[in-house]
C-alpha cells in the first residue's frame, strides 16, 4: 500500500525538518522565542510529519493484515500528510494561512472515518 511508503517518507522528512531548525533552537529568542507563533508552528509542522506518518503506517499495515482497502481513505490520508506540514510552515510566516487547517484536518478525519467504515 502506498500509505506505508508515505509513512517512511514522512519519517525521513520529519527527521530533516527537525534537524534543520534544531541548529538554531539554542537561541532563546530565535523566531521570537519558544512560545512565539512562528516557532510553535514550525514545531507543529515537524511533528506532523511523524504523527500523520504513523497514521499512514497504521492504515497501510492494518489494511494488509485485515485485507481491507479503501482508495478514497488512502488518498485522503496522503492529502493530510502532504498538506498538514505545508499549512503549518506557511502559517508560521503568514498567519492568514491558518484558515487552511481545515484541509489537512478534514482529510485525516474523513480518511480515518472511511477506513473505519471499511473495517466494520
Language-model regions, residue ranges each:
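Polytopic transmembrane helical bundles with strong interfacial aromatic enrichment
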Residues: 1-43, 50-120
Amino acid at each position: 500500500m502506498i500509505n506505508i511508503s508515505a509513512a517512511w517518507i514522512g519519517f525521513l522528512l520529519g527527521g530533516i525538518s527537525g534537524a534543520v531548525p534544531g541548529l538554531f533552537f539554542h537561541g532563546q529568542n530565535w523566531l521570537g522565542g519558544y512560545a512565539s507563533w512562528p516557532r510553535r508552528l514550525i514545531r507543529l509542522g515537524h511533528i506532523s510529519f511523524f504523527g500523520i506518518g504513523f497514521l499512514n503506517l497504521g492504515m497501510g499495515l492494518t489494511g494488509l493484515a485485515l485485507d481491507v482497502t479503501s482508495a478514497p481513505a488512502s488518498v485522503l490520508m496522503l492529502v493530510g500528510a502532504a498538506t498538514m506540514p505545508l499549512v503549518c510552515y506557511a502559517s508560521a510566516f503568514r498567519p492568514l494561512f491558518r484558515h487552511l487547517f481545515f484541509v489537512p484536518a478534514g482529510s485525516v478525519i474523513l480518511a480515518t472515518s472511511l477506513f473505519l467504515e471499511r473495517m466494520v
